[in-house]
Amino acid sequence: MIIKNGMIIYGDEFTIVRSDVLIEDGVIKEVGKNIRAPADMVIDASSHLVIPGLINAHTHVSMVLLRGLAEDVPLQEWLQNYIWPRERELKRKDIYWGTLLGLVEMARSGVTTFVDMYFHIEEVAKATIEVGLRGFLGYGMVDLENREKLEVEIKETEKFYEYVTKINSPLVNFVLAPHAPYTCSLECLKWVSKKANQWNVPVTIHLSETKKEVEEIRKKYGMTPTQLLDEVGLLNEKLIAAHGVWLSEEELRMLSSANATVVHCPASNMKLGSGVFPLRKALDLGVNVALGTDGAASNNTLDMLREMRLASLLQKVAHLNPAIVKSEEILKMATVNPAKALGLKSGVIKEGYIADLALINLRRPHLLPLNSPTSLLIYSARGGDVDTLFVNGEIVILDGEFLTVNEEKILDKFLKVIE
């Protein structure tokens, strides 16, 4: 496979080059001009920007089912009065078709990899394989300090671990997924810590999303949520903590020292009125910061191109400083940084890296002129501009059409499911 004459965002410094890309066995074999090699397919990318596949480091894909369900309310009310009651009604088939729809939406914004926690998680895995994206998936554990509930959550988590091991798919990876320090008991968190070491897998969790959450944890345990994770053995390089809006400077230093990752979810944090993540401070302290959409119920899209734009604009207006964050830093949060968190040799277009690539069609009115490809990607591109997508060197979308699934069938089935 050769991608010919594209405008390439090359390497981890995002150098712009007009070049070809040779893909062999799912890996980028060569990047250079006028590549001459045997190829089963040649794609003309002369009118395209070729970018690393984006990584959505925190989402709940099947929550597209709940898009628009509850608006203009704070997080706790949103969860307790709207989301959790509706989730109790969802069946396996709902999760399956909801995931398919969400994956199609994500793919069209250039997402090749995502991190997801939810229930009926086997259905998420099945849909992930069908569409051809790469998922790091976990059963969302919530025990609310109920011993019987904890036993159920442990059983479900172990069952999914066995499922992932059995199917042995390169597209489905297991993560442990305790929901949050305020919904999981100490016993639950300690069990997760033990299993993370035993199974050598990442741990994704919601952390310091709201001011109220931090105050409740302080009152209950006499420490911050980050200190609590440290206490139970979860503060390490395996940790992928979502939101982090109310992290203190001390906690950011702790996360940096532990080589943990924080996932910034700007749209969700703005929509729920949770606050503004201290991005500049986190980056300056050496925290590995990734980017995520959260679920479509609190965003309300899964468009990672939009999320990059919001991440940049939010910091500029919050600090009244247009230079506070650079486009290249934002792009790293959607590529290089989450790849590091997941131990994935992806997020970069370079020889030896996994061929996760997205081609953006530049022949669109809102994408011209091409003065700065990187800033154009951050501030002008949007979901739907991606017309070709590779995951592991396999084509998922070609010239705007899915090769792996029937998009129209998914739309029809989804509409029937939500009737």
Swiss-Prot record:
Name of the featured protein: 5-methylthioadenosine/S-adenosylhomocysteine deaminase
Amino-acid positions noted as binding Zn(2+) in the UniProt annotation, renumbered to this chain: 58, 60, 206, 294
Role according to the record: Catalyzes the deamination of 5-methylthioadenosine and S-adenosyl-L-homocysteine into 5-methylthioinosine and S-inosyl-L-homocysteine, respectively. Is also able to deaminate adenosine.
Similarity remark: Belongs to the metallo-dependent hydrolases superfamily. MTA/SAH deaminase family.
CDD domains found in the cross-reference section: ATZ_TRZ_like (cd01298)
Enzyme Commission (EC) number: 3.5.4.28, 3.5.4.31
SUPFAM superfamilies: Composite domain of metallo-dependent hydrolases, Metallo-dependent hydrolases
GO molecular function, one term: 5'-methylthioadenosine deaminase activity
Gene: mtaD
Keywords: Hydrolase, Metal-binding, Zinc
Catalytic activity: S-adenosyl-L-homocysteine + H2O + H(+) = S-inosyl-L-homocysteine + NH4(+); S-methyl-5'-thioadenosine + H2O + H(+) = S-methyl-5'-thioinosine + NH4(+)
Cofactor info, note text: Binds 1 zinc ion per subunit.
Positions bound to substrate: 87, 179, 209, 294
Keyword Translocase applies: no
Cofactor(s) required for function per UniProt: Zn(2+)
Keyword check for Zinc: yes
